[in-house]
Amino acid sequence: IAYPKNYEEFQKHKRELDADEHPVRAKLGGEEVLDIQLRGEYAYAALGKGGFRFYDVAQIDNKDFSEKIVTAPVSPFGQKFYVKSKYATAIATPTTLGVDPLRRHDPQNEEQQIHLMYGFLYGTDKYEGLVVLGNNLKEKKDFAGVGTLLDGNPANNFVRRAATFNPDGKLNGARRITIAGVYAYILCDRGLEVVSLDDPLHPKITAEIGSPVLNEPTGVAVQFRYAFVTDKEGLKVFDITHLDQPKLVDGAKVLLGDARNVYLARTYAYVADGKDGMAIIDIERPEHPKLAQMFNANGELRDTRDVKTGMVSSSQFAFVADGEAGFKIVQLFSPVDNDKFYGFSPPPTPKLIARYKTKGPALIVSEGTDRDRGVDESGNQLSVFGRRGARPFNQQEMLRMYMRNGELYTVTNAPPGRPVDSHTPLKAVEEPDQQKKGSGEDK
């Protein structure tokens, strides 16, 4: 241990964490934070009746600042980082990286164009549906979208509502949003609504999945070709090979008693299972999920609302919003207690290592920064690659890896026939006994 005295004090205080920051209260008519997402120097929050607000957290680790979380470092005349709404419930960024589609590109770098949807933030409102946050492109050409959050220029710190989308009230009761490629997966009273953000100022619904497939859905997370959704019954799996049209995978279900939200980390899904603590589900075979273990730290996890995971050195941790029981940190594995920690996805050996008492119920935990994420589910580049002109596969190139004629390309353990030339159309290849005999060409 690097700091034995600090650790000894930590143990004496029963592993209780300290906080050196005064709670920040919203000034827009609401004080509850229903959702939060950190990106760069700002934390984006959905505040119920308080609408949406962006907090300046640039000095969170600076000892020279006494107030480390502020709504604005200047007067209201110089900054407006909030958007009013009737009842804001959730907020999402297309990526946790600082991707700016409005940034000027040098042609010599041979960079791909960044999709416009990355220039906005996306929130849900209980009554208004989907709220697109950012300045309108036509009205604010100098700082359109939310580019002001990324450009480092303090002279343009103003953000407004760019669009509102709730056709025929289909998004009423919207309470959770997850971005996958150019699609938003929104949970609402009707179930799961898939919304295309290909034109972010003119969204459109491409699919709806409601009862009896989904019953009061609470959380959704996406990994490669699958979406994992929690509802009143537990965890369910959807095939999203076609992002705009999710399909339920028959039998891919894990029954749970109080599922509130889900987070994915490689081959495991971590479900906030309310009064039952945290459910750890093996999703190595996504169409055949199975419960790996339930963990409640001997009853200390008793109102689990949300779980996010993160890595520090060679150890993995789960950060748990445990409702009325406060905030908890669970060590999932470390070199000390798991000899398989070097693997791609070590089996979790969870143990509670720290806790923090909150004045109100702990509801949500921000997702950390994505590491090594070069491309999204729709083939849009997210990261700068090492060489000029280097890029990931685009969508069509990705599909060629695992799709044939619109269907998923699979293989069998036993060869179905003789090898064929990969450049020869399959229809032109015939087995020897099917070839015509007696023709002049058969010599």
Range-by-range predicted roles:
Residues 1-443:
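Feature marking well-ordered beta-strand scaffolds used for ligand recognition
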